[in-house]
A protein has these predicted regions:
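N-terminal active-site beta-alpha-beta segment that forms phosphate/nucleotide-binding
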Residues: 1-82, 186
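Conserved phosphate- and dinucleotide-binding cores of soluble alpha/beta proteins
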Residues: 2, 9-11, 65-184
């Protein structure tokens, strides 16, 4: 019998992602832990799930763990490769038809108590135009956070969990309960 008591926090997070995916769900994932978790789910836990990534690949079944959503190892065994433009709006359309069938996992550099995620930049002593650190940005995360049953998965470090994100890349409840109501002004 194998000893499964020696694992890293990241391995446990990837496993938690894989276990929360259900049969026949469409699973939108980005690079990193979400990609690893979805790959594990497809390979070992629920082979009828359908991972999809922002580069347009759907129903991926990688032989090896891909390094990014555009990795050729991901492309080799996917059912569909859409042009990126077709991915835009997919989440909204799927959500309108069956919101329980669609789940997504995103990460980020910062998250606040209202679920707003920053994956764009850390201001530090600067601002948006001259931040201390700049990241790749939204990718598809903004649409995912808006239209999908979204699970936010990030490394558990105190500096990531803050009162107000420096920049809202993907909105949660904006400034609190009711923060996503149509027509409500936000600051």
């Amino acid at each position: 019998m194998s000893d499964y008591t020696k694992y890293t926090k990241q391995e446990m997070q990837a496993y938690a992602i894989a276990k929360s995916i259900k049969e026949n769900q469409i699973v939108i994932v980005g690079t990193g832990l979400p990609l690893i978790g979805a790959s594990l789910a497809k390979r070992a836990i629920c082979p009828s799930c359908h991972p999809i990534v922002e580069s347009g690949l759907m129903d991926c079944d990688p032989v090896e763990v891909p390094r990014s959503v555009g990795d050729n190892r991901f492309m080799a065994h996917c059912a569909v490769q859409w042009p990126n433009i077709r991915f835009v709006g997919f989440e909204a359309n799927e959500w309108l038809h069956d919101e329980d069938r669609l789940v997504a996992f995103i990460g980020g550099a910062q998250i606040d108590p209202y679920g707003n995620v920053n994956s764009t930049c850390i201001f530090g002593k600067g601002d948006y135009l001259q931040p201390t650190t700049r990241f790749t940005g939204s990718g598809g995360a903004n649409g995912i956070a808006t239209y999908c049953n979204t699970i936010i998965m990030m490394q558990h470090q105190k500096r990531r969990f803050i009162d107000h994100v420096d920049y809202i890349t993907s909105c949660g409840w904006m400034d609190g309960p009711g923060g996503r109501e149509i027509g409500r002004a936000h600051v």
